[in-house]
Amino acid sequence: MKYGIVGYSGRMGQEIQKVFSEKGHELVLKVDVNGVEELDSPDVVIDFSSPEALPKTVDLCKKYRAGLVLGTTALKEEHLQMLRELSKEVPVVQAYNFSIGINVLKRFLSELVKVLEDWDVEIVETHHRFKKDAPSGTAILLESALGKSVPIHSLRVGGVPGDHVVVFGNIGETIEIKHRAISRTVFAIGALKAAEFLVGKDPGMYSFEEVIFGGE
């Protein structure tokens, strides 16, 4: 598979390149603040950079008819509309978290909340000091799995890649469910699965859950 990275020189860009190269995939498009280096036509473009970069990313996907794996957070409605339009021409996977564990947790929460429907629920998320958006896209994703609005508490400290704790409470007992991303590698592995999934797919919007669980 030939692939491109938007945000190539960033921390996630470097992690993505490492994971993809270990599987023998060829990096043919590099995009960062210094410009664009085009070596060949990519099958898939990976973008974990910023919402501001999305218009350029969309243009590149259209130019090469390349699928898009988008892990950028803090997207607004205008960005989502751009993705919907792009998905008419190429296959797109957009997710706020490409950790397999988080997406398994999301599915679990959607079932658990049916049993604990009268319990209090709150979410606590912790990320590194450089993360700009709060609450995190992942916390919002987990809230959506609960099917209702719940309090979300955001901490920005040190170099934490990402901790998410969902706390259920009732009189006399609590349940805490925690997911911890130990390194950015987990997100790069998820991006790899999504990219390989997209190769040969018809245009359309695909969820990361479809990548993991298929049609279940």
UniProtKB/Swiss-Prot annotation:
Pfam families in the cross-refs: DapB_C, DapB_N
Catalytic activity: (S)-2,3,4,5-tetrahydrodipicolinate + NAD(+) + H2O = (2S,4S)-4-hydroxy-2,3,4,5-tetrahydrodipicolinate + NADH + H(+); (S)-2,3,4,5-tetrahydrodipicolinate + NADP(+) + H2O = (2S,4S)-4-hydroxy-2,3,4,5-tetrahydrodipicolinate + NADPH + H(+)
Temperature dependence: Is stable for up to 48 hours at 80 degrees Celsius. Has a thermal denaturation midpoint (Tm) of 95.7 degrees Celsius.
GO biological process: diaminopimelate biosynthetic process; lysine biosynthetic process via diaminopimelate
Keywords: Amino-acid biosynthesis, Cytoplasm, Diaminopimelate biosynthesis, Lysine biosynthesis, NAD, NADP, Oxidoreductase
EC number(s) stated in the UniProt entry for this protein: 1.17.1.8
Enzyme class per UniProt: oxidoreductase
Residue positions binding (S)-2,3,4,5-tetrahydrodipicolinate: 128, 137-138
Modes of activity regulation: Is inhibited by high concentrations of NADH.
Pathway of action: Amino-acid biosynthesis; L-lysine biosynthesis via DAP pathway; (S)-tetrahydrodipicolinate from L-aspartate: step 4/4
Tagged with keyword Amino-acid biosynthesis: yes
Binding sites annotated in the UniProt record for NAD(+): 9-12, 71-73, 95-98, 131
GO CC, any one term: cytosol
Principal location class: cytoplasm
Subunit structure: Homotetramer.
PANTHER family, sorted: 4-HYDROXY-TETRAHYDRODIPICOLINATE REDUCTASE 1, CHLOROPLASTIC-RELATED, DIHYDRODIPICOLINATE REDUCTASE
Function description: Catalyzes the conversion of 4-hydroxy-tetrahydrodipicolinate (HTPA) to tetrahydrodipicolinate. Uses NADPH as a reductant with much more efficiency than NADH.
Similarity comment text for this entry: Belongs to the DapB family.
Name of the protein in its database record: 4-hydroxy-tetrahydrodipicolinate reductase
